Amino acid sequence: MSMAYEDYMRQLVQPMRDELVRAGFRELRTSEEVEQFMKQVEGTTFVFVNSVCGCAAGLARPAATQAVLRSEKKPDHLVTVFAGQDKEATAKMREYFVGYPPSSPSMALLKGKEVVHFIPREDIEFHSMEDVMENILAAFDKYCG
C-alpha cells in the first residue's frame, strides 16, 4: 500500500475516531493495548467496534454517544477499536466476543471479560438511530450499576 493512501485513510477516519473519543471512549489501537486493558478490567465495559460505513456514521456512533450521554446507569469503561484500520486490535478484542461472528460496526457490553449484550451490524443497519440507542440504553439499565 502506498504511503499516500495510508495518509489519506488516516485523515479520512480521524473525525470518526474523534466522535467517540469526545464522548469519553478510550481508543485501543494495538493488540497489546487491548490485552493490557482486558487483563486488568473489572466491572462493565461498553466496546464500540468502529467502521467507515454509512450505518456507523449515521446510526451506530450517534446512538452510542447519545446513549452514553443520556443514560443514568453507565458502564465503568468505554473503549473502541476500529475495524479495517486497527486490524490487530480489532481481532484481539473480537477474541473476547465468544459466540459472536465478526461484525462492524458492532457494540458489546461486557461484565468482566464476558459479553452480556451484543449489537451486531444487522441490529443497526435499517433501524432508526433511536431504536439502536434504546437497545443500548436497555442494556445499560439491565447490566450497569
From Swiss-Prot:
Protein name per UniProt: Bacilliredoxin GK1781
Pfam family, one: Disulph_isomer
Family the UniProt entry places it in: Belongs to the bacilliredoxin family.
Domain of life: Bacteria
Organism (species): Geobacillus kaustophilus (strain HTA426)
GO BP field: cell redox homeostasis
